[in-house]
Amino acid sequence: MKIVVNGYSGSGKSTLARRLGELYQIPVLHLDTVHWLPGWEEKAEEQERSEVRAFMDRNASWVIDGNYRKLEYERRLQEADRIIFMDFNRFSCLFRAYRRYLDHKGRARSSMTEGCEEKLDLEFIRWILWDSRTRKQKKLWRAMKETCGEKTVVLKNQRQLDGFLESLSGQKNPTEFP
């Protein structure tokens, strides 16, 4: 089973990816850990792509969370058996990011590179509320959903996420993935 978890910042991609990895006992790659070096420094693109390719090549099953179009995006979508798109509204994402900040203040969360302390600055708030939701970005999301429609699950709120997770409870066979 290969699962891609995409969506807006603060929507819960990493948490869902971790839960799916635990449920199906398959490795999880958080693309934030690939992209960032300690101190919020960006890695060289080719090194990032190489790490993602190596992860995908060495694992028959995986969960990968994060958007990062330059990091084997087309390959991830093509190889995925299931794509989950976290389409939560901007205010829900901001609230979730704020809660995450309070939970991890002064340290890195487990889905982030060590040395990248959790932050909620004006730049990130702007990203959550506006910059990640441009017409161009929405057009790209629509294209992904149309191209990969039959294997895409769109979750728009916590109730849908809870229902989705409930539908998975007790399943140990990834081929039964809804």
Locate predicted features:
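Hydrophobic positions on the alpha1 helix immediately C-terminal to the Walker A/P-loop
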Residues: L16
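NTP-dependent small-molecule kinase module
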Residues: L23, I128-P178
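Conserved lysine of the Walker
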Residues: K13
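Hydrophobic anchor at the beta1->P-loop junction of P-loop NTPases
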Residues: V5
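The conserved Walker
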Residues: S9
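A glycine- and Lys/Arg-enriched "phosphate-lid" helix/loop adjacent to the NTP-binding pocket
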Residues: F88-R135
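Active-site signature of alpha/beta-hydrolase-fold catalytic machinery across serine-
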Residues: R19
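Conserved nucleotide-sensing/catalytic segment adjacent to the nucleotide-binding pocket
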Residues: L29-R82, F88
